[in-house]
């Protein structure tokens, strides 16, 4: 149905074409469905493809079992198979990539040869080209990823600027937002691990939790007043796994140099030092309606302990 639809068909069977020039070049391909101007235009021998929308699957020649729904969806696919694209320009640039699923405007739009990616949400995995085994759920999640592999992003703008980082997991809007090349990171919570572009093997759990280096684990932001559990933390102390044992560490002499003090924590200064991202109203992300939710507790909570710089100096003096 439509001018030039199925014009070149020779032995292809069970094809349906609706729209000007739909399935225009098909010769022997079978079981294809094309709906929209120039949909599946270049298909020759490809089978079991479904294209709905103007120029959807336009360049497909021999690719099989692809489904495209939306203007320009899977537009440049040639031999890629088992791809599903739903939304304007979704998987638009895919050529030979296989087993990709894109749902949302411009999702996986730049993918060319990447395989086994899943993108759900407008502009999710937008610039992925060759990355494989990535999963993005949420608007602009993994938006800038190009060649990064095995990343999982759940939440709007999660892993937004990741380009080449691998094996990252981000759950929560804006989690791991600024990561570009860091790998093996985990962020769970709204704004968790927001800053830091190249850290690796770090974990941030909780709203607005900040990571400042690789190989860190952080629980909660600086508004947290208690972290506890049924048992205490443990650390490796087994002599079987320690080498070069020597009694060279200062003991009592080091303790005598320490100066116990009482203090209040200036959380506003800490936020500035850690570059905690600001909200739209300019307040810290640990604030609500312009007032820090926990400030009354800060003011009342007198702490005791040591000054880190003084402990460091004592250690240096004793070698």
Region annotations inferred by a language model:
Residues 3, 20, 37, 54, ...:
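Trimeric beta-solenoid/beta-helix "fiber body" segments of extracellular/virion adhesins
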Residues 236-319:
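Intramolecular chaperone/auto-protease modules of tailspike-like proteins
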Residues 1, 5, 16-18, 33-35, ...:
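Extended alpha-helical scaffolds used as interaction platforms
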Residues 132, 151-152, 166, 240:
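Intrinsically disordered, low-complexity regions of eukaryotic proteins
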Residues 175, 179-251, 256-258, 285, ...:
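Small/polar residue-rich beta-strand/coil "junction" motifs that cap repeat-based extracellular fibers
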Residues 5-6, 12, 22-23, 29, ...:
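Conserved SAM-binding site of S-adenosyl-L-methionine-dependent methyltransferases, i.e.
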């Amino acid at each position: 149905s439509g001018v030039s639809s199925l014009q070149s068909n020779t032995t292809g069977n069970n094809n349906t074409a609706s729209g000007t020039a739909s399935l225009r070049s098909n010769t022997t391909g079978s079981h294809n469905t094309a709906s929209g101007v120039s949909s599946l235009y270049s298909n020759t021998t490809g089978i079991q493809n479904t294209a709905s929308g103007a120029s959807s699957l336009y360049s497909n020649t021999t690719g099989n079992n692809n489904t495209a729904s939306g203007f320009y969806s899977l537009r440049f696919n040639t031999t890629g198979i088992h791809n599903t694209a739903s939304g304007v320009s979704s998987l638009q640039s895919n050529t030979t990539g296989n087993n990709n699923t894109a749902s949302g405007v411009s999702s996986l739009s730049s993918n060319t040869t990447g395989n086994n990616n899943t993108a759900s949400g407008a502009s999710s995995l937008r610039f992925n080209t060759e990355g494989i085994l990535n999963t993005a759920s949420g608007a602009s999640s993994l938006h800038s990823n190009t060649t990064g592999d095995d990343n999982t992003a759940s939440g709007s703008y999660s892993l937004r600027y990741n380009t080449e980082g691998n094996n990252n997991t981000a759950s929560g809007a804006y989690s791991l937002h600024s990561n570009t090349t860091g790998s093996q990171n985990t962020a769970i919570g709204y704004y968790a691990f927001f800053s830091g572009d190249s850290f690796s093997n770090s974990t941030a759990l909780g709203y607005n939790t900040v990571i400042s280096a690789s190989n860190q684990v952080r629980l909660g932001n600086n508004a947290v007043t208690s972290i506890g559990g049924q048992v205490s933390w443990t650390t490796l102390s087994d002599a079987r796994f320690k080498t070069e044992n020597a009694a060279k560490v200062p003991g009592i002499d080091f303790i005598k140099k320490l100066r116990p003090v009482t203090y209040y924590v200036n959380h506003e200064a800490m936020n500035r030092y850690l570059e905690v991202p600001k909200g739209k109203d300019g307040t810290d992300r640990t604030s609500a309606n312009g007032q820090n939710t926990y400030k009354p507790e800060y003011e009342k909570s007198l702490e005791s302990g040591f000054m880190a710089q003084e402990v460091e100096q004592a250690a240096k003096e004793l070698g």
